[in-house]
Amino acid sequence: MKLPTLGKCVVRTLMGAVALGAISVNAQTLSSNSTGTNNGFYYTFWKDSGDASMTLLSGGRYQSSWGNSTNNWVGGKGWNPGNNSRVISYSGSYGVDSSQNSYLALYGWTRSPLIEYYVIESYGSYNPASCSGGTDYGSFQSDGATYNVRRCQRVNQPSIDGTQTFYQYFSVRNPKKGFGNISGTITFANHVNFWASKGLNLGNHNYQVLATEGYQSRGSSDITVSEGTSGGGTSSVGGASSSVNSSTGGGSSGGITVRARGANGSEHINLRVGGAVVANWTLGTSFQNYLYSGNASGDIQVQFDNDASGRDVVVDYIIVNGETRQAEDMEHNSAVYANGRCGGGSYSENMHCNGEIGFGYTYDCFSGNCSGGNGGSNSSAGNSSSGNTGGGGSNCSGYVGITFDDGPNSNTATLVNLLRQNNLTPVTWFNQGNNVASNAHLMSQQLSVGEVHNHSYTHPHMTSWTYQQVYDELNRTNQAIQNAGAPKPTLFRPPYGELNSTIQQAAQALGLRVVTWDVDSQDWNGASAAAIANAANQLQNGQVILMHDGSYTNTNSAIAQIATNLRAKGLCPGRIDPNTGRAVAPSSSGGSSSVALSSSSRSSSSAGGNTGGNCQCNWWGTFYPLCQTQTSGWGWENSRSCISTSTCNSQGTGGGGVVCN
């Protein structure tokens, strides 16, 4: 793979560059690493070897050239600091071809969080959207093109703050600009807004430049950059072209309209918001608008649940916040039959199998033109009067993922008690299968304060493993967790955060969403309790922190301060949505009476399964059938997981309980 670290080396110019003396107003050619200002613009130039050079010209213009003797180089002109709202215009020539490994991009850094970002306008032989181990976040339209968004993680790599672990955000233009004479406009706010809608937040800006970059290649550029005017309006989900039918019965703030039809007229769908079924309908054979008029908040899914011979569902779109979201623009579709299996495709309006299409969050605004609220503060779904103690309080302005790896073990009971005492629930446990097998009796304690998911069986390095080896390791862990009485995991955190396409494919085949972290507490590296609490204090809405359940006693000592700091910021613990990997609100807080379900959804047999009569268990925002024969813990009845009444009602603050119609 080429170019996975391009841009990293720019950082070294900030740490050890040879500073220029007084900058001349005349053209000046740089052949040594340097940063500074020139004719009112910030510039950066770095190379690790070879003949690459950059010439500073008037205003925002620079020229560059490099040959195959240069391993890696990058340079450009722009601003320091950058900002979220700048509109960047550029023009000139980009002298590479499709065989050369190079980018032309808006490039920059932020702190708190530490983020390296790219808006790729053109590239050669390597498409950065294929970076190994990354996560795709869909696409949007800006400045006359579609941009595909991907996030990658860099582990212990150079940054503007030394060697760090951080995320890269990529927006990659499609179609790319090409080569030769080139010009364009980047309305950066559109990228910032779309990233933020997916939980990809920027921090405080450092530099921001229109950069040329090359890796083991040859080429040249002559680029002039300036601040311009927007050429492409607000961002929107790519491809959303259908208009809203004038007969729609909804779409205003606080309601959701689903436009759908069935193949034979007996298909049944549920509307799920924040993990709960809020409405359900039996479809006709022609498109109709189905209206939910409540105000539930959270992630939105349309679920098909009675697949049989001759039954298929077509979902045209939904309307929320006055915005139309086309089904074919949504990445998550576990019901489409493609590539020889159910759930084998994306971006389709068809539902051939039982499953769901994910439509984002109620507070998202993909088009930038919404009539309802789309701020993070609207993500709270609770009707509880319990304040902000626990994961669903009415004072929550956002939700974060509190996660612990490597359990269960001798520390688990102590940690569970601390979490309860400080109302820091729900949490997400990423368990090792071998520890589960040895300590199955601790599973119920973990489940009493959150959810349990997959962290491999033996915590190995797996990047050199075959697909089958990875699959077996993860599947063995799933079985251990289920044998101990927990539901089948839907999330997987790779050991050491190491990820490649093989690991990703094996996880997907097992129905596991790969989840890493936004903030590393460094508890595994000997961080003090104060340092761990300070790390947690960096969390923003939707983000996830890495901590550990084990011999790291400083983690236990930090729990009280973490809880205090989060409450002061209006942030509450949440669950991690398996569709997005983001922390979201539990759909309930403070007991079963706070669960907001419509009467039609409560009576639906599909909502709670065939066990437990007309009752079901709200387990930290996810609904499971009640066991009929098992009296305690989790069970397996009628070919699916179930939960006993006593265990369901044992959840702590922020949990749910038994819900009956």
Curated annotation (Swiss-Prot):
Induction: Induced when the bacterium is cultured on xylan or beta-glucan but not on medium containing mannan. Is repressed by glucose. Transcription of xyn11A occurs in early exponential phase, and thus earlier than transcription of xyn11B.
GO biological process: xylan catabolic process
Domain CBM10: 616-645
Keyword Signal: yes
Record's keyword terms, sorted: Carbohydrate metabolism, Glycosidase, Hydrolase, Multifunctional enzyme, Polysaccharide degradation, Secreted, Signal, Xylan degradation
Superkingdom, taxonomy of origin: Bacteria
All residue ranges annotated as the GH11 domain in the record: 29-226
Residues of the NodB homology domain: 398-574
Main location (coarse class): secreted
Residues annotated as catalytic: E116 (nucleophile), E213 (proton donor)
EC number: 3.2.1.8, 3.1.1.72
Reaction catalysis annotation: Endohydrolysis of (1->4)-beta-D-xylosidic linkages in xylans; Deacetylation of xylans and xylo-oligosaccharides
UniProt feature, compositional bias: Low complexity: 237-247, 581-608
Record region (Polysaccharide deacetylase): 394-577
Enzyme class at the top of the EC tree: hydrolase
Pathway assigned in UniProt: Glycan degradation; xylan degradation
Position of the signal peptide: 1-27
GO cellular component terms listed in the entry, alphabetical order: extracellular region
Subcellular location: Secreted
Region called Disordered, residue ranges: 220-259, 578-610
Role noted for this protein: Endo-acting xylanase which specifically cleaves internal linkages on the xylan backbone, releasing xylooligosaccharides. Is able to hydrolyze oat spelt xylan and the arabinoxylans from wheat and rye, releasing xylobiose as the major product. Also likely catalyzes, via its C-terminal domain, the removal of acetyl groups from acetylated xylan. Thus, has the capability of hydrolyzing acetylated xylan. Does not attack mannan, galactan, arabinan or any cellulosic substrates.
Entry note about domains: The N-terminal domain possesses xylanase activity, the central region likely has xylan deacetylase activity, and the small C-terminal domain is involved in carbohydrate-binding.
Family from the record: In the N-terminal section; belongs to the glycosyl hydrolase 11 (cellulase G) family.
PANTHER family associated with the record: ENDO-1,4-BETA-XYLANASE A-RELATED
Name of the protein described by the UniProt record: Bifunctional xylanase/xylan deacetylase
Organism: Cellvibrio japonicus (Pseudomonas fluorescens subsp. cellulosa)
